[in-house]
Amino acid sequence: MLQPQIKLNAKNEIYVPGDKSISHRTVLFCALSQGKSEIHGFLEGEDPLHTLRCFESMGLSVSSLGKGSYSVVSPGKQNLNSPKGVLDFGNAGTGIRLSAGLLAGLPGMNATLTGDASLCKRPMARIMNPLQEMGASVISVEGNDRAPLRIEGKQLKDYSYVSPIASAQIKSALVLAALASDISIEYKESEVSRDHTENMIRFLGGTITHHSSVHFTVKPPYHFEGTKYVIPGDISSAAFFIVFGLCVGGSEPLLIKNIGLNPSRIGILTVLQNMGGKIEIIAKRVECGEEIGDLLVYPSKLKRTVITEDLIPSIIDEIPILTIAGLFSEGGFQISHAEELRAKESDRIRSMVSNLERLGVKVKEVNDGYEFDEVGTIQNAKIETFMDHRIAMSFAILSKLSGVSLSFDDTSWVDTSFPGFFEILKSV
């Protein structure tokens, strides 16, 4: 296994930016609510800012209250305007899919949703098909089940759906469509996916009836009023420094403060602890319906572990950085049941395998994942990021830990989710 070439600096306490998933959803729930809301801890990365700007063009009044803080006034969902131009979501898959659901349920809304070249390659049929079954008019402009999407808002009908995959984006798109159209929705999935949307509904006074952990119903009335949102740090962003803190040399812990610990998102902690990582959760609390805490991460000897299928939905965004942990693990690393990785910002299975091979790692790629045996050395290489922020950050962590010189074709994608990443990496 690889050996770390650095130890922590004296400064062993960091904060990471606000949760990306919650930041997107906060904008959408501000739009659905009547009146003034305040948002604190908003991720000022390109993805959530694109979503915020899109809804600003439809009638939200947005003013800055300082770094990561905004005042947002909504005329109410029934008074949102059709945008005059195309809604550009940049690289934000969450933004475009969830917004498509919400807008599809607003009668009289007319909008075209698009994004950058990477986003326009990502599959949209997974939300288009069930939305159309609800009575929505959502079509792919190019006829290829990809963005741009043209939406004509309709009054939708009550709907029951069994999702073929565990996807918080599909679930949230359909639930937001139901909230917009004041209808009931019954939803069932195969595994528990992240539930920030459900938490936000409850936080705003809505009722969700759970039939099981993967099966629920949401019914009107939905009367949401403006409120104050406080967004915790993103555990998907913290994951890069959790792995860094586990794999670094020495014995001093790294303290990562104010992290969202939603049970549907902490699979990363479970996997790393199963690999032998020592991670302590302190200062636990609940805010705006979300569990929060601070993480103490200790340098640890890691080993290969079996990552079970039920954990995949809760670690899908963290698999690239878990792979880096695998390079520092006894016995190597394996991931399977992760076909969904092929539909992310890049085909993350191919992206990770391609870059690992550039490092000289012998990797076996299969349709739903990849594996490699214990690694002793890696070589200098140029990393291709495939326009994917998590690929860029994962290999930047590897370069810092290993001391191996890695160059990158483009690291600007990091700003979509983690502005300030390289400054924090330099500071530790």
From Swiss-Prot:
Gene Ontology terms: biological process: amino acid biosynthetic process; aromatic amino acid family biosynthetic process; chorismate biosynthetic process
Pathway(s) per entry: Metabolic intermediate biosynthesis; chorismate biosynthesis; chorismate from D-erythrose 4-phosphate and phosphoenolpyruvate: step 6/7
Example of a GO MF term: 3-phosphoshikimate 1-carboxyvinyltransferase activity
Alphabetical list of Gene3D superfamilies matching this protein: Enolpyruvate transferase domain
Listed transmembrane segments: none
Top-level EC class as recorded in UniProt: transferase
Reactions catalysed, as given in the entry: 3-phosphoshikimate + phosphoenolpyruvate = 5-O-(1-carboxyvinyl)-3-phosphoshikimate + phosphate
Source species, domain of life: Bacteria
Cellular localisation: Cytoplasm
Active site residues of this protein: 317
Recorded GO CC terms: cytoplasm
Binding-site positions, phosphoenolpyruvate: 20, 93, 122, 169, 348, 390
E.C. number: 2.5.1.19
Family per similarity comment: Belongs to the EPSP synthase family.
Record note on quaternary structure: Monomer.
Entries under NCBIfam families matching the protein: aroA
Protein name per its UniProtKB record: 3-phosphoshikimate 1-carboxyvinyltransferase
Native source organism of the sequence: Leptospira biflexa serovar Patoc (strain Patoc 1 / ATCC 23582 / Paris)
